[in-house]
Amino acid sequence: MLKLLIADDEKTIRETIRSFIDWEALDIEVVGTAKDGIEAYNMILDLYPDIVLTDIRMPGLSGLELIEKMYEINKDMQFIILSGYNEFEYAKTAMQYGVRHYLLKPCSEQQIINSIREIKQDYQIRMAQKNILAEHDQLKNQFYTSMLINIVNHYLAQGSDLTPEQEDSFYTEYRRHFGNAR
């Protein structure tokens, strides 16, 4: 379940968004609402939401300032901007920080839901990619370890010119690194 924070200086908008959308059906947990940019910033640092739905103009920090600050900390956090301002400069600045969802007020419930679904889909793809990369790294390490063990075992099977002391030291180090894999 992804976590969502709603930030808007208008109480009616915060409450409407929180109550009219069936967040549970979207597998989203609304972790809080913030009445200004500073409160939103502090809540983000405390609650680590995956998605922040924010107004563009708020007291304390604007939505753009909030996005900029959070971008420095967590580039994976996703933002949906709700704005009453149809100004290209706002959207352009937001896009520089990875924001892909800029909704004009008044927007419909369905527009918010569509943005949430897109973000969720992108999130699932990113997580799948991270898991594949982690699995790849693990398999690569297992492969190299197995290759090294096989090379060493082949060398030992051919016989060596090691003294008994050197052989004991070698086997001690071998077991330390590879266990009893012989």
What is each of the regions a protein language model found here?
Residues 107-182:
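Interdomain helical linkers/hinges and coiled-coil/dimerization scaffolds
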Residues 8, 25, 139-143:
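Residue-level detector of secondary-structure boundary/capping sites
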Residues 11-32:
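Two-component/phosphorelay signaling modules centered on CheY-like receiver
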Residues 23, 38-139:
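CheY-like receiver
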Residues 1-4:
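Extreme N-terminal starter segment of soluble prokaryotic enzymes
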Residues 7-8, 34, 52:
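Conserved sequence signature across two-component system core domains
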Residues 9-11, 56:
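Generic detector of well-ordered alpha-helical packing
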